[in-house]
């Protein structure tokens, strides 16, 4: 069966991959850049991440199951903890509303 997937972001690409592995003839249409909001750009000589900055539920989430079933290459996900960079210092991201308030 011929199938058109509209959108080459993470969901569209993973859907196309799964459909292709099931034997379908798949065409992905993307108006901008493949990867959607999950990509890096070179701006004034600096590599800047655009879009997704965290991927969760890697132990047994849907992304891991799709990659395990359909991908040729399984990325090595490393856990860095719940931190972000602000003014050259690492700041812990609060996990509860009470932590946000203090």
Curated annotation (Swiss-Prot):
Superkingdom in the source lineage: Archaea
Gene3D superfamilies cross-referenced by the UniProt entry: FAD/NAD(P)-binding domain (3.50.50.60)
One Pfam family linked to the record: NAD_binding_8
Stored InterPro entries: FAD/NAD-bd_sf (IPR036188)
SUPFAM superfamilies: FAD/NAD(P)-binding domain
Name listed for the protein in its UniProt record: Uncharacterized protein in nifH2 3'region
Source organism: Methanothermococcus thermolithotrophicus
């Amino acid at each position: 069966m011929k199938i058109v997937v509209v959108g080459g972001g993470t969901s569209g690409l993973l859907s196309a991959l799964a459909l292709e592995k099931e034997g379908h003839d798949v065409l992905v249409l993307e108006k901008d850049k493949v990867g959607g909001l999950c990509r890096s750009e070179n701006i004034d000589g600096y590599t800047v991440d655009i879009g997704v900055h965290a991927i969760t539920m890697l132990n047994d989430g849907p992304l891991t199951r799709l990659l395990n079933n359909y991908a040729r290459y399984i990325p090595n996900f490393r856990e860095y903890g719940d931190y972000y960079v602000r003014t050259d210092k690492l700041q812990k991201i609060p996990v509860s509303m009470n932590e946000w308030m203090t």
